[in-house]
Amino acid sequence: MPQAKNAPAASFDSLQTELDQKFAYPASSKTYIAGSRPDLRVPMRTIKQTATRTDQGEMLNPPIPVYDTSGPYSDPDVHIDLKAGLAPLRAKWIDERGDTVVLPSLSSEYGQARAHDPATAHLRFAQLTNPRRAKPGANVSQMHYARRGIITPEMEYVALRESLNLQALQDKPEYRKLLKQHPGFSYGANLPQRPEDITPEFVRQEIAAGRAIIPANINHVELEPMAIGRNFRVKINGNLGNSAVTSSLAEEVEKMVWSIRWGADTIMDLSTGKHIHETREWILRNSPVPIGTVPIYQALDKTGGVAEDLTWEMFRDTLIEQAEQGVDYFTIHAGVLLRYVPLTADRITGIVSRGGSIMAKWCLAHHKENFLYTHFDEICEIMKAYDVSFSLGDGLRPGCIADSNDAAQFGELYTLGELTKKAWEHDVQVMIEGPGHVPLQRVQANMDEELKHCFEAPFYTLGPLVTDIAPGYDHITSGIGAANIGWYGTAMLCYVTPKEHLGLPDKEDVREGIITYKIAAHAADLAKGWPGAQLRDNALSKARFEFRWEDQFNLGLDPEKARAFHDETLPAEGAKIAHFCSMCGPKFCSMKITQEVRDYAASLDANATAAEHGMEEKSIEFRKAGAKIYS
């Protein structure tokens, strides 16, 4: 898929043309780990390395497996038809459980109206099937199965995906050195110590305890299951969505594909413009990753934008509408209570959450308690009928570092803990949303408070941004906070782009934001000691020392940018096998000099004494040449 162009796709036909070209990763192949059944094949990406050249000949370097979020879009053997959607990967698994029914029609009044509206017929996804719902009295959540001791195909899928089958590589000599890593410090997390410890039973236990979720609506059958939890790899979320002034359906699908190409583990559709229902349908039918929404946005749209006119009945219908489309998790701001709203009065930035401000306005206008809070049990009944996970929203998150960790923020957090317990009584999966803007020295307190008051439910944070002085660079200010809070225990990081606070991001901004957050998440995995996390670092470091430039590019998170930066100063093809870069040049490359010393030592029997002798001779040569570092 061409990445140089920043212009959005004008139509589904033009986007289809791009997808037909595939967005092949350099030197990579799509590989699958086989599960316990023929229809359980877990994807990963394998990066091929070139050989190391030595005086004695070539030494082969092994391929490196990496976690892959791109779904079938990067599989050359799969034909993608956007108008038909992706293959129904989970349909058989769900059907086999025997606890759901296929509905004769949509349950939502709004959904039915959209399905029969001639004005939107040209926008409608044509290949729709009737939605599923739990049988009366049944609970179809992954937490419910886990608490009954059932290991679902989704749980097995997650175990294989998280381990990357690294246990099969441990006894191979070519991987032994590459698989070494520093011990991590996990702040009390229950991390698996070895790849073989990441079993389906381990996943089941984490889901049953509420420490992790598998967001997987029974109506999102195209989904490749993944886990969000403190004791798994740190995940990242990317946002997309139309607004009143921008975007077409094709553009939003393109943003989704673009985001997962660069590594987004989940996508939140934050659409607030026209055709929200149709946009979401197209995204879901073509998405291999979980999709989250903020249902209050669409409910508000149904009132014409008047928060005071929101009703529980309208919101309930919106939940059912979206659940029957297949949304995997809902952000619900049920912790914005009437008594907390006055606590924001002395803040510099007040209430910055859109959902939080909507509910605060409703509470004040009616002088009633938040209807999301008072109807929470009814919301849980809907969630467990479709296996939609809660993302309990932080509607009172701080919008600047001056407002961080105040009474409003933590008061809401404690209420979210209360609601977590209530959701778990229904066996509904929960994660907790967090800030926001927090200076570095106050970041860990956010994690500690969440773990204590929300009982280790997965934490999902927006950054946090650790300073407010860098408009245009908030992917960096937030990436710093994200790496730290990920290390402390946050399970998923919501990306921030360079356009944060300034405007709507384009494709390159999205790419920049995702790569920044992949760095933060990986740094956190290294710090907490996720098994095998250092493999890619070690492989790239070895390639760097051996001047295998193509491998350096290909093993990186953004091969295109790395290659482009290198070629700005050394564009010739020969430079990609040269034993220097433009930073030091051929005479002063530290790695080249070190290799020369090693080679010299090897010629003198390659023992420690010879290495020391080699250094002494180099010292004599250096002094004879005038002892000048620069000439």
Swiss-Prot record:
Single biological process term from Gene Ontology: thiamine diphosphate biosynthetic process
Cofactor: binding details: Binds 1 [4Fe-4S] cluster per subunit. The cluster is coordinated with 3 cysteines and an exchangeable S-adenosyl-L-methionine.
Keyword Oxidoreductase tagged: no
Positions annotated to bind [4Fe-4S] cluster: C581, C584, C589
The protein's required cofactors: [4Fe-4S] cluster
This enzyme's EC code(s): 4.1.99.17
Function according to Swiss-Prot or TrEMBL: Catalyzes the synthesis of the hydroxymethylpyrimidine phosphate (HMP-P) moiety of thiamine from aminoimidazole ribotide (AIR) in a radical S-adenosyl-L-methionine (SAM)-dependent reaction.
Protein family per UniProt: Belongs to the ThiC family.
Name recorded for this polypeptide: Phosphomethylpyrimidine synthase
Protein source organism: Ralstonia nicotianae (strain ATCC BAA-1114 / GMI1000)
